[in-house]
Amino acid sequence: MNTLFKIALLIATLNISVFAETNSITAAIDAGYTSSYLVNNLVQAKDAAVAGVTVGKTYAGVDFSLKGQYLPIASGTDSSHWGLGAGKSFEVLKELSVRTEAGVTRHQTGQALIQNYTEVNARVALENDFFVPYVKGIYNVELEQSGATVGIEKRFSLYDFNFAPAVEYTLLTDAKTYAVKLAVSRNIWKNLDAFTEVAYIKNDFSTSNINFALKEFDGLVGTGGLRWTF
């Protein structure tokens, strides 16, 4: 099953690259490594390579996206995460807009402690040239976890580097998470970008019956890799 999935992912990636060059869509592939794979700032996998595919298309003013990530878990059971999303921005003032997004993601966790589950979410952000506040509603169907994330982020460029610091607080049915993040990226050749993210994550669980994370985490998470945009 895992071999067939890897072959399918390779074929899909090749088809996406050809399709993106001949159609008005955006597409990207990336590969890297993470010390902890996070979903809503909860640890779903440890010390894993990550390969991803993203495809986007704008139609009638709405941005549609398809995203997938694949992790070969060390235990031998692979993990994959696939999502569909749609978003639209509404201009309020010349340099101020409201961004609304909604999506659904299927998480094949590859972990005995965390069952496979489907997440439905919706996000609203107040986009501007300064700080961007946002709120995201979350509902995990099989895990029976629901709640919201509130956060604020800032995006800016300096000396050819792109920076995106963010602070988040997430409240779910049985968990609270606090996160401080810094993402950095830089174009290194043509359509090839290098990226990294460092985050401090602190979890606070209100139950000992944990089925939504590997463990209650308090520490640093590092992620890095390369991304090719078509």
Regions found by a protein language model. Give the residues of each.
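Repeated loop/turn-to-beta-strand initiation elements of outer-membrane beta-barrel proteins
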Residues: 27-29, 59-66, 93-100, 129-135, ...
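Solvent-exposed loop/turn segments connecting transmembrane beta-strands
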Residues: 39-47, 71-81, 107-117, 138-148, ...
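Cleavable N-terminal export/targeting peptides
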Residues: 1-28, 229-230
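Residues on the lipid-exposed face of transmembrane beta-strands in outer-membrane beta-barrel proteins
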Residues: 31-33, 51-57, 84-88, 104, ...
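Outer-membrane beta-barrel initiation region
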Residues: 21-57
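Outer-membrane beta-barrel "beta-signal"
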Residues: 216-230
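Outer membrane beta-barrel transmembrane domains
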Residues: 162-205, 227
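Transmembrane beta-strands of outer-membrane beta-barrel pores
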Residues: 33-37, 59, 68-74, 90, ...
